[in-house]
Amino acid sequence: NFVSGGFNGQISVIGLPSGSTLKIIPVFSVHPENGYGFSEETKPMLETSHGFIPWDDQHHLALSQTNGEIDGRYLFANANNTPRVAKIDLKSFKTTEILEIPNSAGNHSSPFLTENTEYVVAGTRFAVPVDGEGDVPIESFKENFKGYLSFIGIGKEDGKMDITFQ
């Protein structure tokens, strides 16, 4: 069973029915035990448009699917503090990609997958200004702030994530 780590930014793999922790998968936080977030391979994944963010509030998980059935290729996780989605490869049980989502604040409502994992859908928790600069008077909230849904495309062959449309 995969369990969200919440504020520790990690995922726990829990054995059932024993409840034993089988593995900790670092995702949105540094993990000194195995060097995650310190190595040349993993440190860039914790870089955001706001700089190096070595922690996050990881909330929800979703397993990849084929024809609506779990296929065991990937596990996707959201970050609530800085709007990001991560992909964990279930062959290696390692985080292989983290994508920051533009025009979003508080990526709580994600990840939701289409039935063949063509898209991961992520919704912003809070409305954001649509001017591209994020600098508009609060008095203009009704006219200038919107909530976005982001559709993150998943490459069929390589599983690479990209913002396809919002």
Identify the meaning behind each predicted range.
Residues N1-Q166:
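Predominantly soluble domains enriched in secretory-pathway, periplasmic, or organellar proteins
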